[in-house]
Amino acid sequence: MGIRDAAYPGSFDPITFGHVNIVKRSIERFDNLYVVVVNNPNKKYLFSLQERIEMVKKDLEDIPNVIVESFDGLLVNYLKEKKIYNLIRGLRAVSDYEYELQMANANHMLFPQLEIFFLMADTDFSYISSSMIKEIASYNGDVSKWVSKFVELKLKEKLLKK
């Protein structure tokens, strides 16, 4: 843990190739990247926290210096506890920016030493979201362009078992 480490938080419900792209681009700039699977009690998830952690670990297992952890609570408390001063956020569109700017301002007020880095989504992934992928998968649509085989299988198990 230290000044050259960063955190990339998200619900990852499920993890997509867009998330993986942000991780790969982030790890080039930092010594270690903590991918933090967050658990917000006010949010409804398709996958349990343990399932989301399993998918994230599987999809990121070949990327060195990536540490997958989970946290529920205020993100800045996790960052302070770990002594992580850099936060990565991915942006797909202008609509993401408004929300992320509000969150960045709040986080900076709570943790003034925090540097927040916004990475624009690669154009190949700028239009995808976990919600969109879940909807397509729920109709047995092909999501292989956006998620790994492992995640695709987990989606089918979860959504098509009914």
UniProtKB/Swiss-Prot annotation:
EC number: 2.7.7.3
Residues bound to ATP: S11, F12, H19, G90, L91, R92, E100, F125, S126, Y127, I128, S129, S130, S131
Database matches in Pfam families: CTP_transf_like
Main subcellular location of this protein, as a coarse class: cytoplasm
Sorted UniProt keywords: ATP-binding, Coenzyme A biosynthesis, Cytoplasm, Magnesium, Nucleotide-binding, Nucleotidyltransferase, Transferase
Compartments where found: Cytoplasm
Cofactor names: Mg(2+)
Subunit structure: Homohexamer.
Protein known as: Phosphopantetheine adenylyltransferase
Organism of derivation: Petrotoga mobilis (strain DSM 10674 / SJ95)
